[in-house]
């Protein structure tokens, strides 16, 4: 059997608030790595506190990639992410360093690790037309349109997911072919690195829920709401007819804060809604991660030694690895 000679990389996966950022930083410092963000909120400029974006000290200690790529009124697709991530990984490998893929956006991980079919490129005029229709008939009405032309995609896409509804209709209107047919085509070439997938997830749901609540309270203490007020004051966002349909504003926490600042409920109600939305996100992430059959799961508090052993074993054949203190 042929030996897989591809360079190595580590994917640090897990639900929100599970400790992925801390592990990625520790691993990068120990094994001469650079971090590639796999997070759909971190690509947006201005999303800092609510997205738990690595701060200046973290970025000074370890190189980070795929942060602050778009303004919050723009869109960034999974295909764009996969292309940018491949380029970043190739550059990291060329420098003789270890790529560490860290984040919790399942669509981005799938696009990168499994590949995507070659969908038609985005057409801003078509997107604008669909957005205008949404203002008239709502996203539920557009979802019904999608169900008529692509029932397979409509069954997979929730009626409250405007970004995916818009993309599916855009592809159909550009090409005349349902997006589900495009997605059934063979994916692109495999990733030119061999990846160890590690999942950080507390064994008890109550522990994860407590971490989620603690992180939200820490965000509020750091003046998260002022950050959202600054976003709301941007002229480009004020010019958007439906800002809550933008991917950046729909990011968990930001959407609930935006609605609160619109006058929807009390501060306590905002906190409860944000915590509940984050729990729901974590639940979806865990559902996706259970389908990653080749991933290895670790409790972030209990399994530190087992996690270290798994990484050390994976990297055993990697030459010239510089190490510092333990994970």
From Swiss-Prot:
What Pfam families does the annotation carry?
IPPT
Please name the GO terms of the biological process aspect recorded for this protein, alphabetically. Answer: tRNA modification
Residues of the region (Interaction with substrate tRNA) are: 39-42, 163-167
Residues that, per the record, bind ATP: 14-21
- Keyword tags: ATP-binding, Magnesium, Nucleotide-binding, Transferase, tRNA processing
Which cofactors does this gene product need? Answer: Mg(2+)
Give the site residues for Interaction with substrate tRNA. 105, 127
Positions of substrate binding: 16-21
EC code(s) of this entry:
2.5.1.75
UniProt-recorded Gene Ontology molecular function terms: ATP binding; tRNA dimethylallyltransferase activity
Q: Does the keyword Metal-binding apply?
A: no
Enumerate the catalysed reactions: adenosine(37) in tRNA + dimethylallyl diphosphate = N(6)-dimethylallyladenosine(37) in tRNA + diphosphate
SUPFAM superfamilies per UniProt: P-loop containing nucleoside triphosphate hydrolases
Q: Which InterPro entries match?
A: Dimethylallyltransferase, IPT, P-loop_NTPase
Q: What does this protein do?
A: Catalyzes the transfer of a dimethylallyl group onto the adenine at position 37 in tRNAs that read codons beginning with uridine, leading to the formation of N6-(dimethylallyl)adenosine (i(6)A).
Q: Which family does it belong to?
A: Belongs to the IPP transferase family.
Task: State the oligomer form and interacting partners.
Answer: Monomer.
Tell me the NCBIfam families matching this sequence: miaA
Question: What protein is this chain from?
Answer: tRNA dimethylallyltransferase
- Species source reads Xanthomonas axonopodis pv. citri (strain 306)
Q: Which gene encodes it?
A: miaA
